[in-house]
Amino acid sequence: MLQVKHELSDAKYRTTVREEDFVHENQGTQNSDTIIQSNEFSRSRIKALLENGISPSALNKFLACPLDFYYRYVIGLGEMEELEESMEAATLGIVVHQVLEKLFEPFEGSVIGSDDIKKFLPQIETQLDLAIQEKYTKDNELSGFDLITKGVARRMIENVFKFEIERLEGKQVKIEGVEESLEASLPMNKVGRTELVKLKGLADRIDSENGHFHIIDFKTGKVEPKQVTFQESDEKWLTDRNGKLIQLLSYTYMWHKKGVDPEKISATLFGLKQSKQGYVPLHRGKNEARVTEADMERFEKELLDVIVKMLEISEFAHHPEAKYCEFCTQ
């Protein structure tokens, strides 16, 4: 709050700072007792979802809270999208991702190095303004907290490029894809027949260097190495607590299914608030061993187990340890 007060006191923002005490009263009620029975409609919707392609996000939602999964993916409420009057912090990532996409996209299929990334820096402000205008009302001049949010977005983007400039000093990588669609089909054995279900995803960027592939996903939230570390001794990898791990295992699996040795794939997360940390890779054990063919086989088996649970679920109820979504607090 002190930072906000200091920033807004600047005369150029034309903003008056007024301090008030505020007590928040939560008007929403948590409908934790809501239970929805599975029926022919829900089963057909889940089957269609699996045929068209289920994303790591949907898998994570099912594991974290079946009721939330029902609302978002079975009856299709999804995320509410609208043209916003102000820059909400929750959608900061959308703007940052869009700017990164626009600047890297022209180099898709090309080899780039440190000098190429340096040319991105003068373009940040223009691309950031365009992204904000597209996401928010065009006739609303940014002021106050929105200007601070824009500044945060700018610094996040600058930090990505500064990190890449240093990382690529003296070498080059090929941009294999930007906002790259990934998918893989899995055979699921049912009584007397085999059906295919599809896993799909969208990687922010994929690079390659000397036959090795680097899958990148940018995160506005906090990223910790333990969130993408797995052990052979773990009882299960696909659990409600392993959202980021499931995402990177899924990306690795889908790229592996293109015929790439998993040991030549490094799926990573980049915390935009922790740019000095750099890329945080998916790895096995404390020694940061690479993912193996055996790991992919185990992932596929666990994935099919989750899919079977989706198809056979009898009721959709709130997970007691999950946060309440907006659908449960109305």
Which residues make up each language-model segment?
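RecB-family 4Fe-4S metal-dependent nuclease core
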Residues: 1-330
